[in-house]
Amino acid sequence: ELTRLVQAVLSVCRAPLVLDADGINAAAPHIDVLRGCACPVVLTPHDGEFLRLGGDPKAADRTQEAMRLADRTHAVLLLKGSRTVITDGLNVYVNHTGNPGLAAGGSGDVLAGMLVSLLGQHIMPREAAAAAAWLHGSAADLAAQELGEYGMVPEDLLLRIPRLLL
C-alpha cells in the first residue's frame, strides 16, 4: 500500500524528498511522521491536498496558514495557487508568476521535476522550491503569451524552460 511505502521512505531517506499528489495523500493521515524525518521534505499541495494535510485553504491569511503547517511538519511547503506560497515556517516567498493555464493536468508534475532537479544540485529546499515555482510560473507566462493560457499542456512549459535559464 502506498501509505506504508511513503512511511518507509520517510523513515530511511537521507536525501531531500519531494511529496506531491498521491505522496501527499498517502502521508496526510500520518503527517506528524514528517517531524521526525531525517531528510529535508518539500510538500507541494494544491488546496485540496492542503486541506487533507490539516491546512485551511480558505483561511483569511493563506500565508500564515501555510507557515503554520510548515512549522507543524518541519517541511518546506510550496502551496500552489494563483499566488504560490513557499515557506519553511519562518521565511516566506510568494510567487507572482503563472496563470490559469497551470491548472492543466500534469503541470504539477513539471513543477515537481524542476524541484527535484534543483534539490539534486544541492540547492537548499526553501530556495529550490522558490526557484522552481518562479521557473514554472514564468514558463507558463511565456506559453500564454505565445499560445494563450487555455489549452496549455505540460510540454508547453517544458519547451520554454531553457529560455528562462539562459
Feature locations, PLM:
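Glycine-rich phosphate/dinucleotide-binding loop and adjoining beta-alpha-beta core of small-molecule
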Residues: 1-97
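Short, charged, surface-exposed loops that flank catalytic or proteolytic processing sites
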Residues: 56-64, 122-130, 148-152
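Short beta-alpha connecting loops at secondary-structure transitions
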Residues: 48-54, 96-102, 112, 141-149
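Alpha-helical structural signal
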Residues: 6, 111-115, 154
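Short, small-residue alpha-helix embedded
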Residues: 52, 104-135
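N-terminal loops that bind phosphate or other acidic moieties
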Residues: 8, 33, 85, 122-123, ...
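Charged C-terminal helix
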Residues: 138-166
